Amino acid sequence: MGIILFVLGLPGSGKSAAARHIKSFARRKKFQARRFKDYTILNKMFQKDMEAKRFRSTRRQGYDGFDVLDFNVFDEALQKLHHDILRRKKLADNSRELLIIEFSRDDYCEALSFFSSLGLRYAHFLFINSEILSCKARIKARADHPRTLDDRYVSDYIFEAYYKRDQQQYLKTAIQFNQRFGIPLDHIHAIHNGSDITVQQFFQEVEAFANDILKIKV
């Protein structure tokens, strides 16, 4: 059995950057790292929503993206993400497999219930914490000057309409994970990525965290 890692946090918090860095770091350590994220699924759902009943384009705002109007699609996307993980190509030796699962939600306890078949009590969790103003600033910067496929636009609307429920009280969330799913508290970690943190400092913390969880298999 390999390692399952959930990377969670608000859009613009730095979770995608963290997930990419962990994947690269793990491969240098000879792990078979695979990353699963729900954005691709949501984007496909948006493209199929020809009548714009569940999504709305953000082209009027000058960006190629979408807003979610029907929040039920968030659950549907997680169901599909779970399905894709279960149907992934199996490795001959999965002992050094690292599955990185990445998404943002307003209620992580409810979101995690879609992944109960993965053996959550053995999984690891990394929350990326950042002020909303910092998240929005990063989103604008990355949308104006994209450098990776993760550099997508997210509007202010979805922060106000949906993500406002995520108060980023991740210590409280950790206790809920422990009580509901039996996840050990020492499997849950949070990294602050506010405006006072440099990119180098952030990646140093991310790498130290990744090194700790990968040591389990060394």
Model features per residue range: what roles?
Residues 7:
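Hydrophobic anchor at the beta1->P-loop junction of P-loop NTPases
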Residues 10:
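P-loop (Walker A) phosphate-binding loop of NTP-binding proteins
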Residues 13-14:
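Conserved glycine(s) of the Walker
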Residues 17-83:
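Conserved substrate/cofactor phosphate-moiety recognition/catalytic segment
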Residues 22-28, 112-122, 140, 144:
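Short, surface-exposed basic-aromatic patches at helix termini and helix-loop junctions that form
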Residues 63-120:
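Glycine-rich phosphate-binding loop used to anchor ATP phosphates in small-molecule kinases
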Residues 120-173:
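A glycine- and Lys/Arg-enriched "phosphate-lid" helix/loop adjacent to the NTP-binding pocket
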Residues 164-218:
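NTP-dependent small-molecule kinase module
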